Amino acid sequence: MGQKINPLGFRLGTTQDHYSLWFAQPKNFFEGLQEDQKIRNCIKNYVQKNMKISSGVEGIGHIEIQKRIDVIQVIIYLGFPKFLTEGKPKRIKELQINVQKELNCMNRKLNISITRIENPYMHPNVLAEFIAGQLKNRVSFRKAMKKAIELTEQSNTKGIQVQIAGRLDGKEIARAEWVREGRVPLQTLRAKINYCSYTVRTIYGVLGIKIWIFVDEE
């Protein structure tokens, strides 16, 4: 049987960089990981609660965390930053307070900055959120996958593969359906592959969405 591996972890150090940049003693490492998870969850929850974009897409590509002894630098890569940049100082300040409360670390300085993603639909997280929104609105999963591929083609990618698994269209038996457009060379290490795994809750149950996007070859 074929052994599956996460395409991002497989390419770390070649075409993929770490999203968390910090060092810690082995005995304190788990605390740093938990802290990162709290920061990411807090930001995602805040954006989700305050989102007013009609598409329902949060547009968070990824969140990068850099830590020094007394400073935590958080960079949010957003596809649709209008929401946070409209009332920028107020919203970012509010977000900073929320994160600091969650971490309970008033002795360390927290900086949050926003970077706009030029081609949002080149990022599988943004695309997965779009598909999840369509499925929640009871759009057929095949239509949702087709529309997602069309959006990606506008971003000049070389290939995309989308897989949705679960009780599709409310059927009794769960199954997995996938579609591929272009090339997606998962075995080639120098191929820059963007990947995400996303869970969406629908009225029929939980569906899993996986997206692989072949961006370029280095």
Swiss-Prot record:
InterPro entries: KH_dom-like_a/b, KH_dom_type_2, KH_sf_prok-type, Ribosomal_S3_C_sf, Ribosomal_uS3_bac-typ, Ribosomal_uS3_C, Ribosomal_uS3_CS. Keywords: Chloroplast, Plastid, Ribonucleoprotein, Ribosomal protein, RNA-binding, rRNA-binding. Part of the 30S ribosomal subunit. This is Small ribosomal subunit protein uS3c. One of its GO terms (molecular function) is structural constituent of ribosome. NCBIfam families: rpsC_bact. One of its GO terms (cellular component) is cytosolic small ribosomal subunit. It is found in: Plastid, Chloroplast. GO terms for biological process: translation. Residues 43-118 form the KH type-2 domain. PANTHER family: 30S/40S RIBOSOMAL PROTEIN S3, SMALL RIBOSOMAL SUBUNIT PROTEIN US3C.
